[in-house]
Amino acid sequence: MSKKIAVLITDEFEDSEFTSPADEFRKAGHEVITIEKQAGKTVKGKKGEASVTIDKSIDEVTPAEFDALLLPGGHSPDYLRGDNRFVTFTRDFVNSGKPVFAICHGPQLLISADVIRGRKLTAVKPIIIDVKNAGAEFYDQEVVVDKDQLVTSRTPDDLPAFNREALRLLGA
């Protein structure tokens, strides 16, 4: 069954951490909807390898419209967490119990949303202390799945495992 996957993304996202999962989700028949401050805007990856035209504005969506949430890394999550609309969307999504996929710096939005206390996850090395300070149990491994809801990975090298577990939770 086709699922709708929300992606919170803005400029300087880690190119492959969006393109790889998005391609795999689409191949499995799922719909990927990109969300930023402004619909129709084009955002660029930090390596300049990918650009994405935003489908929806954060003001026109709610977590109830989606089946899963993807939080790619790079600088994008840090930029987005400065806007409470994205933090609230993330918090409400996690609290809904639906799958959330966060890689590299993606957990920065989870930290700002205060939803990882007592959860198991991994992330890129520079934010390990932030993950621990937010009350999560950190695991240095390619993919961590917590409560069959939260899938996290560290870097683009972990994308095969990240994509595999995300697709498993989507039922694909």
Curated annotation (Swiss-Prot):
Leading EC class: hydrolase
Source domain of life: Bacteria
Phenotype when the gene is knocked out: Cells lacking this gene are highly sensitive to oxidative, thermal, UV, and pH stresses, but only slightly sensitive to salt stress and insensitive to cold stress. They display increased protein glycation levels, and decreased viability in methylglyoxal- or glucose-containing media. They also show highly increased DNA and RNA glycation levels, and exhibit strong mutator phenotypes.
GO molecular function per UniProt: glyoxalase III activity; identical protein binding; protein deglycase activity
Coiled-coil residue windows: none
GO biological process: DNA repair; guanine deglycation; protein repair; response to heat; response to oxidative stress; response to pH; response to UV
Keyword Repeat set for record: no
Stated role: Protein and nucleotide deglycase that catalyzes the deglycation of the Maillard adducts formed between amino groups of proteins or nucleotides and reactive carbonyl groups of glyoxals. Thus, functions as a protein deglycase that repairs methylglyoxal- and glyoxal-glycated proteins, and releases repaired proteins and lactate or glycolate, respectively. Deglycates cysteine, arginine and lysine residues in proteins, and thus reactivates these proteins by reversing glycation by glyoxals.
Name of the protein in its database record: Protein/nucleic acid deglycase 2
